[in-house]
């Protein structure tokens, strides 16, 4: 089964990572092992790495393909120490995320780190079982199928033990508390979840004029373009003067989607100018290419944008910040981003997809290499206490306050260390797969 070129990605979820553009077909070597056996895959994928890996000169000269019991073990052994982003996924899982935008589950993402007694809901996919059960951002899950959240942590229960197998129809009982302290007891059943990436589009009145708010999470994927077209049509109709773009939980994805989003924001301000350049290793310098801002119907023609960030703001999301910065005033509110100024052009072989780092990204000024993340202009701790667009959200409230006053204000005071402390060096796959149910 020959490898075929897939999309170029800047990020991933369960799977791939970030990138975007020009791909070339590589022909797998004849490894001498049974086709698609583990040693064969190890040999073929290592050969791909030797050719296209950004840090190919840091690889060992050769490997013993029989020394590893999986392609993941091989990659973990040979990867460059700075690389926490390259990874493998099964092709079906890759396609489900980037192309089909589906998974089997209840349809929500949660944060389990900020409260020992609750899973706090980050976002809920439209039309999912979670939405039908009344779950929304800011709700606190306190009991899942008879397990308290403290029990889950104390007993180190697996995701499958708590939420069940990834099978349609599997049902659990849940208890959750709304922000107004209403307690809900209900059931949810797993189904095929169609994932959306635009979670809210609205207008917030302010002293700075009409402020558009766009919550864009969960990736820069195939359906995103149509969602963004609809969102910016709505914002343009409202004649917004400013934009707050919420990228707090967006791990990235297609460079092409990032280019379209940036063009919607800047419009005539940067039309035809360089958004980003993808630079491959010296063996593949002929694959370097530049993505420019393009003319978009309903573009906002802004000279300033405020972007909400966390350490889960990654890859293509960071590309938006870095790519817009030479052309307009970019204000970030929240905390430092994840630090992924590199991307992948995935390679497929034997129904496995290798998303290895192939290129770095730089803006029109040649700026990149932000492996410690992009610092926040105004540092504010992310607290999930309300639904999208609510000014009870301290990060959104700080962003609106910045537009009203031109400064970070008291809410962000005393938190400046957040802007210079690098985010945790989580492996990228862990960052993208955690807490999606």
Task: Name each model-derived stretch.
Residues 19-242, 417-437:
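Flexible, low-complexity junctional segments that flank or bridge functional domains
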